Amino acid sequence: MKRFKKILLIIMVIGFLFAGFQITLRFLAEQRNKMVEIVADYKDFSDIALQLNIPEKEMANKLIGSGVTSIAISEERLLDMKDEGKLLLYSGVDLNYLNVHFNNEYSSLATSAKSYLDNNLIPYSNVTLVLGNNEDTYNFLINSFKTRFRGITIDFKEGNNFCILINRSMDKVKNVGLGLTDEDFEEATKLGFNNIIPRVENHEGITPEEVDSLYSQVKKYKVRTIIFAGVTVFGQDYQDEKEEILKFIGEKFSQTDAEIITAIIEKPAETDLETIQRGIKSLSKYSNYVNTKVYSADLAQLQKLTYEGLVEQWGRAISQRNVRILYVRPLAKAEKTVSENFENTLKAIKEIKNRIKYMGMELGNAKGLGSVKQNRYFQLIMGFGIISSGFFLLLIVFEEDKLKKFLKAIYILYGIILLGLMFVYLILPVYNLFGDLANKLLALIATISFASIGGVWLIEYSERCRELKDKSNIKEGILLLIVSVLVAGIGGVFVGAILSDSKYILKLDTFRGVKISFLLPLLIWGFAYVIKIGLFKDSNNKPLPLLEQCKKLFETQVTVKYVAIAGVFLVALAIIVMRSGNTMVSSASSFELTFRNLLEKYLVARPRTKELIAFPILLLIPCLAKFKSREWSFIAMGAGMIGIENVINSFCHIRMPVFVTTLSTIFSLIFAIIIGSICVVIVDKIKEKF
């Protein structure tokens, strides 16, 4: 059995070396992606300029001076064009009052439209009329309506005057995106920003010719990034089951040396991005992940947040969620004037600009992440290492004499699992079908096995410390803490490596096993404690058999004190589990948020709260282990397990950069050594007195 254990260790080491190489590739890809772009919404700030009665150019200069690098422009809409004086917009029912609404240069066209509706028995209430006298506007609308309102429009012309009937009610057409005009780009160019970002909207029946036209237009104005507007990406069509248009767009926009980056909207952790913009996963895959993530505070946040709070939101998005485009809209607090909200928005932009530089990043045009290459043969070797860790855990939990009769079955099971992995990873059609599932299962096994190995180490080292009465509690505590974190870190590297595909980094796919990986290692640790130390012992001070211990436990009379302690423990555990993973249910308290914000302001990577609490407790274990009663060391180990699990949990947040995850744990260790050492001195003093 010792030989088998050595073989498992060797395979784990080899797997870890390959995992280290893979996670290094991911780290290098993330390090190349250090350009942050600050984008202002043109319409929002144009409205602010109008309310403050200042020229748009002056508004633009203020934004650029604060740190804004780019301006986002939205597609034309009938309602906006009406407000800008480019056209007139009427509901069909207005034709009932010709003399009131059309007693002008358009009266003849309106009469023709009315006759057409009457002759074709079309109800006025189902119709919208668009009128104007500009040839460029007419040509733009006709070309746009051919695709947006295919087959439901008819137009009338007299000289430059035109009337276009749309066989849809006003509510259904007034806010439909109609595309971008050259005039929109030229006006934005004059404002002096480095980059123009069009907000492109989807519509049914997009053709390759339309894609080519859009690509030519954005290239003409040196556009580098597109952010999709609406609930579907440009090209998403339910009737296009083979996704031919999405594939065409993805390949077109990701051409080498001529790529247009498509931005992915960043939303809360529990939100599936496909529900925000349908088609984004497929388009990202077809564009070889030449994508970046964009974050914008929503209206509810803008109405609530102070400028400091907005900066914290932006900073967290950049450092912890790999966001590289900040989409800026003005603060909108009701108790502030428009001018005050605008000035506070400028303050927030200046503050985040400074923080971006403090993080070691640069302001400029965002770059696409690109494809982080994964080699399935490397994944196979990592898989061997992860499976070996599970069997290694089995061998260190149970005593050798208890496993002897099962050794043959263990060897056979181990071989079957390795053969199964080879079948999945070596046969390409099988890998294409089940590779993702296999990677997620292996990641789940790694989170459970390495956290549990760390838990078993706590038990064994704690027992060893009981016999070392004269040794330094601080040195022993630091050793225990570092080894525990290293074991967990190895598991984290396996997880971060096997899930280092671009789709996980961009959060187009998610690892959902974090809550299970929090609970199971705790149960395994408790099980190992009962087997190795025992809640009940025989006359030789050896742990009773498991079933006998369970029987005695159920027969034990329990006081209210222990019920209360158990209740507190279960509530705390429930909160921790709900707040773990990629689908957080329970939020942090206002005090914790304030503390987090303070740490994030001065540290590039904030130590995670659970680690800040659990790591110092881990350092206390050797000191507490020397108490006659094992109760305190047992409680400390249980609390310390949360910290060990949290190290691996941090790597499960794949969208968080590897550098930030690692640095966060290092900061937690530094704080823990300082705080924990002080606590050890205090506990030692208390022991001397009592």
Task: Give, region by region, the residue ranges found by the protein language model.
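Membrane-interface motif at the C-terminal end of an N-terminal transmembrane signal
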Residues: 15-35
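Alpha-helical transmembrane segments of integral membrane proteins
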Residues: 2-18, 22, 384-690
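Large, well-folded core regions of big proteins
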Residues: 328, 341-384, 391-426
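Soluble extramembrane regions of membrane proteins in the secretory/endomembrane system
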Residues: 29-376
